[in-house]
A protein has these predicted regions:
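Residue-level hotspots at or immediately adjacent to binding/recognition sites across diverse folds
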Residues: 1-126
Length: 126
């Protein structure tokens, strides 16, 4: 169900909150504005996947991570074209920054580190 067919398309990141709930993100990094068929979700441990949040202005992203201890509700996604946050399991996204990153990891429930474009940044969430 994901955008594919070119060497620049596909899934670029996957994260699981627990053994059942997972989210994958990607797209086409040469056409980062395409915001459909680039996000998929599973609720059964990866047996089935469905597209989610199509046409919601969240185009290509290179990394997605669940917030620890968020019951699988909160996600952070980064890419060379920005940072975005979801509080509803990835259905809707809020754009936080135009700063570009390639990867992100959480230190704890409220602190994440993102890296890319020659920089490392800390994000603090309340």
């Amino acid at each position: 169900p994901i955008l594919q067919g070119e060497s620049t398309t596909g899934i670029f990141s996957i994260d699981f909150y627990d053994k059942n709930n997972g989210y994958a993100i990607g797209g086409d990094y040469t056409k980062p504005e395409i915001d459909s068929l680039n996000k998929i979700i599973t609720r059964d441990g990866g047996k089935t996947w469905k597209t989610i949040a199509n046409n919601n202005n969240l185009g290509y992203r290179s990394c997605v991570q669940y917030f620890p201890n968020s019951n699988g509700k909160k996600l952070l996604a980064v890419g060379f074209n920005g940072v975005d946050y979801s509080s509803d399991s990835g259905l809707n996204w809020k754009h936080l920054s135009d700063d570009g990153y390639y990867t992100v990891r959480f230190l704890n429930d409220t602190t994440a580190y993102a890296a890319g474009n020659g920089k490392i940044s800390q994000f603090i969430f309340k």
